[in-house]
Amino acid sequence: MRGLGDAILCAESFIDNEPFAVLLGDDIIYHEQEPAMHQLMRMYNKYGATMVGCQTLNGEQAVPRNILQSVATEKTGISRFLNVEKVVGHEADGKSAMLGRYVLTPDIFEILRRVQPDENGEIRLADALKIMASRQAVYTCQIEGKRYDVGNQLDYLKATVEYALWRENLGEDFKEYLKERI
């Protein structure tokens, strides 16, 4: 694959000049009252601009992350996207990182077609968002909920166990099973 930007370009013929959602499978976000994508769509419907889901990192999340540089707005939970940089480890503590959740407007396609591939030959969505933000409003939206990076083996296992425990039809039986195992 030639990067996330290339994957999004492959979907262009299906979009029909409408805003669309991008959900990356390695980020799972649990929020009991309002799913992450619903939070982003609500903000898109309110402001009518590209939305980038983000969350503040803590010390446990030490893998390389795309850290957002943004400017606060008068809108609660919404900031104006400026830039993104890759940060590793504790340098990322307390900073806002991109999640794998986006609501994009169709003008991203023209920008993606012009983005120069990086040193690995990948077309990066982050690069396209920087260009888009220089032309029009692009917002970051703080997503509420518990995030699991299921590309990380331990987070994958935690998500599996916690989701099973939350399910009404499995929770009690699964809890008993875990007690037997431990």
Named regions from a protein language model:
Residues A62-I67, V71-I78:
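Cationic, amphipathic, low-complexity alpha-helical segments enriched
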Residues M1-R65, L104-P106, R113:
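Conserved beta-loop-beta/alpha segment of the NTase-like Rossmann-fold superfamily
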Residues A11, L68-S70, V84-V87:
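Generic low-polarity alpha-helical segments
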Residues E180-I182:
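Domain-scale signature associated with acetyltransferase and cell-envelope carbohydrate enzymes
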Residues C54-L57, Q69-S70, F81-L82:
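ATP/pyrophosphate-binding catalytic subdomain of soluble kinases
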Residues A21, E34, M41-N45, E74-Y148, ...:
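Catalytic-core segments of class I nucleotidyltransferases/pyrophosphorylases
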